Amino acid sequence: PYDSEWKDRVRTRIRRSDGVIALISKNSLSSTGQKWEINCANEENVPLRGIWAYKNDRTELEGVSAFVWTWDNIKAFIDSV
């Protein structure tokens, strides 16, 4: 459903990034675009951090280590890249 131009633009942005933060929720399980972006970050060896978008939703996605949304968790990831 995503054209090659979109994928090329996203891949270029991911390659230029020091890291990628993915907001994870139950909707992530059916989001083909988000799954593609996560796989792309992994393929490009760009550090990836999952952040759960909601306090009552702890959806797990394969290939993503997810953490609670706190500024300390986000800061720790940014400081690590």
Language model segments and positions:
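A short helix->loop->beta-strand "cap" motif at the edges of active sites that frequently abuts
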Residues: 43-51
